[in-house]
A protein has these predicted regions:
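N-terminal segment immediately downstream of the Sec signal-peptide cleavage site
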Residues: 31-63
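Extracellular low-complexity Ser/Thr/Asn/Gly-rich intrinsically disordered segments
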Residues: 23, 29, 59-64, 88, ...
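Contiguous, well-ordered beta-strand patches that form the walls/edges
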Residues: 43-51, 66-175, 180-201
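Sec-dependent bacterial lipoprotein signal peptides
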Residues: 1-19
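Bacterial Sec-dependent N-terminal signal peptides
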Residues: 13-39
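Basic side chains
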Residues: 2-3, 22-23, 200
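Intrinsically disordered, low-complexity segments enriched in glycine/proline and serine/threonine
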Residues: 5-6, 25-26, 192
Length: 201
């Protein structure tokens, strides 16, 4: 199960799409960073034998998203956390998503640049296992301590390096935010399932 968790977490920036809104028209209007500033959070939900919680904080041109794994259904007991911090947030042209909801949704494309990528373990058994197996090429894992994993190979995946540019799209619906990121190009759709819903805190 741990190996499955590693693979799923490493790819957390590429959401599994159960329902999505496809991007459509863009306009000449440019959105501003302030419309998505704040702290956002998904519901606590089951994922690969654990319970997952995603959080996003946007402040100025900084963007930090975390994927937390917990051992209880209320997401109160920490297990692991992956955190990515980006800078240079730049919002592009406004967009309309005709396939989102009954009246469509509004949003925009944006770009950000990776500035930090960390992994934190809150379970002593997993700390021991990771040290034994040199997970991410690291043998000095410490409980409750974030480790830099940018550019490292963790399991079968090599994580992105600092300075990597990401291309994103978001949909804003009142207090609900949906978004997607890719280091290759803008995705064609945005996940809008219940577990992809970030609610403003």
């Amino acid at each position: 199960m741990k190996k499955m968790l590693y693979v799923l977490v490493i790819t957390f920036l590429s959401f599994t799409i159960y329902s999505c809104a496809k991007k459509s028209d863009s306009s000449s209007t440019t959105a501003t960073n302030t419309v998505i500033e704040g702290t956002w959070q998904t519901p606590c939900h089951s994922s690969s034998g654990y319970y997952k919680l995603n959080k996003l904080t946007v402040s100025g041109t900084n963007w930090t998203d975390t994927t937390e794994y917990h051992t209880d259904s209320s997401c109160a007991t920490d297990y692991t956390k992956w955190s990515t911090t980006f800078g240079s947030l730049s919002i592009g042209s406004a967009m309309v998503f005709d396939s989102y909801g009954s009246s469509g949704g509004s949003g925009a494309q944006f770009t950000i640049t990776l500035s930090e990528y960390t992994y934190t373990i809150y379970n002593s058994g997993l700390v021991s296992s990771n040290n034994t197996n040199s997970y991410c090429g690291i043998t000095d894992w410490v409980l409750n301590t974030a480790h830099d994993v940018a550019g490292k190979t963790c399991g079968s995946s090599t994580l992105q390096s600092i300075g990597t540019a990401y291309y994103g799209i978001y949909i804003l619906d009142g207090s609900k935010l949906f978004w997607t990121l890719s280091s290759d190009a803008y995705n064609d759709s945005v996940p809008t399932g219940d577990n992809d819903t970030f609610t403003k805190q």
